[in-house]
Amino acid sequence: MTNIKSVIEKSMKAIKNKGFKGQINVFSTESKNASFSNGKLEQLTEGEKGAVGIKVISPDGRTATASSNIFTEEGIMQAVEKAIEMIKYTEKDDANDISNDEEFTYIDWAFDTDTKDMDLHEVMNLAQELEKKAKSEDERIKFVRGAEYEVALTRIHFGNTNGLYKNALFTNAAGSISLAAIEGEDSSFGFDYQLSQSYRLIDIDRIVKDSVEMAVSGLKSEVLSSGRYDIVMSPFASSMFLGTLITPLSGENVYKGKSFLKDKLGEKVANSSVTLLHDPMNGSAPIIASFDNEGTNTSRFNVIENGNLKVFLHNIYSAKKLGAKPTGNSFASVESPNPSIGTINLHFIANKTRKDILN
């Protein structure tokens, strides 16, 4: 498909001519990937995958979605027709709507030409180097389950029947490793990964060091007694912890009564030292976005500030239901092209650090 914008305009015109509102997300990712395990090349791939997500809303608020991985005008129009056909089976709800955020910031600092232009042989060499360095880092590393390196170029196009058209282009590089340390009868698993906008920011030596330290530190480990401890969470553990907060902070879950935070807006929900920031346009983050996949412009805001819950994460639907404004937190992907509430670059702000713990 040579002119995606033209096809988006045609598909939205077809929806509008039926008297409906609609939106479309088009994702395309070109990637190169290599992985090694115990000295053997396990995977070497280069290719492109894509997906199209369609949402249609009737005048009485019924809505239906459809998706397709056929990147032709015919394939996209078939998805549109499928969504229109399904809409009669859904319930009326006047909170279903589309964005009218016309202006947006085109992000060009998330694209790295050298990362885009890396060939498959270079990617393979980096994956192999990652494995070799891990094996030589410590004699107790006996087994590398997987050393992987990948570079990708992603294109995103969004349009709707209000005439919006927004697009983004960005690169990513990622390195990861999983390995095992063995000493006598003891064994322990370690892993680490990095994701960035450019291959230059992937530090293979750091990945090796952190994964080996994790594996070796688990040898001859002991189970702690139950109690209250000061802890320092690794970046991976922190990300898993933050992931558990997205569900209760979702405006849809609040509206449906599924969140334990539903009556806590404006109240203290955490220690005063806790500030939780959503910062989707942070230039140093591995993934950034100036608009979400409903076309709402993103922004930087505190979800929790000094322990107080300031705002929920909203898409257009939940914002209308709760009398709020959309926060730009409706995201989709090439794997799931119709959006749901999520975050990009959600992280804690360190108000105070106990140096006596870290030292």
Regions found by a protein language model. Give the residues of each.
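N-terminal small-residue-enriched
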Residues: M1-N359
